[in-house]
Amino acid sequence: MRKAMLTTIGVPLLMVATSADAARSDLTTAVSRTATDLIETWRGQGRRGQILRFVQPSLIGLIDGTISTLAPIFAAAFLAGSHAALMVGLAASIGAAISMGLSEALSDDGELSGRGSAAVRGALTGIATFVGGTFHALPFLINDTPTALKVAYVVVGMELITIAWVRRRFLSVPVHRSLIQVTMGGCVVAALGALMGHV
């Protein structure tokens, strides 16, 4: 009786586990193929194609994610502390990533402009936006708000330097000019967030 019950319970569990393993394997294969396809597409493009199809969508997302989420994160930090800033930052990053990804994908299907797959550009923009917004939210895993803010300032600085490097590498924008342009925007947004956090 007990053996029959164990068999009755065990077989479905084994089937579920096998199905989960198969699904995981399929997902891994799909991700690997997608990454390989993207790399091959990148290599097959000229410099102009690389910029229009890959660099520009990613850069737009990185700049937007880095700058647009500063205000809500710092406002939440000053108003309610580290945990609130972390949650607000993650929520803002997710919302911005979805919004920017859809905007990029829906605003240009790539046929007239020659900018390639709308889905790929949308995905790149969305991922870059999420990364840009999330990195300076992660310091608020630190419970001590003043310490978290100091770490966040350093992370934001690193993000701005990365943006300046990408613009220099692919768009030939001088590093100092890029830093001034992006830093000014970031400072304005961060200052507004801090101001709102003290109201």
Label each region the model flagged.
Residues M1-K3:
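Positively charged n-region of N-terminal signal peptides that target proteins for export
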Residues L79-A80, F140-D144, L171-S172:
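Short helix-capping/hinge motifs at transmembrane helix termini and TM-loop junctions
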Residues S113-S117, L138, V166, V182-M184:
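Short, surface-exposed, charge-dense and proline/glycine-enriched linear segments
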Residues H136, F140, I163-R168, G193:
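Structural signal for membrane-spanning alpha-helices in multi-pass inner-membrane proteins
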Residues T162-V188:
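Interfacial loop-to-transmembrane junctions
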